Amino acid sequence: MKWYTDYLSAYEKPYSELPPPLTNRVKKRIRELKHPNPLVSVVAIAHNEGNRIFSCLWSICENNCHFPIEIIVVNNHSTDNTESILKKLGVTYYNEEQKGPGFARQCGLNHAKGKYCVCIDSDTMYPPLYITTMTKALQQKGVMAAYALWSFLPDKHYSQTGLFFL
């Protein structure tokens, strides 16, 4: 089974149609991951991602990392039910009214408490070692930033092994 198969079952699905045992499990994991002193802040930006953000947060909650993290979502002027879902899940979020990914990422970074920040998009599902891989890259001497291209659903442009560091 590919790592994204489970997450794909919730992708593009209205939150109201997701099984309560699953949403409760993700809510619980979000609570468990909240740390007052995180090493890593995972900052997700969202604009009208009501049917996709659950898959993203589910994949982040199940990432294999053995250090404290915090998850921050920036709701960037959404007009759908994105904010309602964030409230239901109990994830830390902030509203950014200035439209655009730059404003949203900056808002998240302004609230981040971690030594390292991993910026993600909320319409994407992330592989099990994504946070650890990015953090290891950032911890290398002399490294100031890391970038990854991940094709979570292989297509003709990107293979399923499309994780690259530049």
Language-model regions, residue ranges each:
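Short beta-strand/loop segment that forms part of the nucleotide-sugar
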Residues: 44, 68-77, 94
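Short alpha-helix within the catalytic core of nucleotide-sugar-dependent glycosyltransferases
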Residues: 57-58, 83, 114, 128-139
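A conserved acidic beta->alpha catalytic loop
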Residues: 59, 75-83, 124
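Glycine-rich, basic loop-to-helix element that forms the pyrophosphate-binding segment
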Residues: 96-112
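Conserved donor NDP-sugar-binding/catalytic core segment of glycosyltransferases
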Residues: 129-160
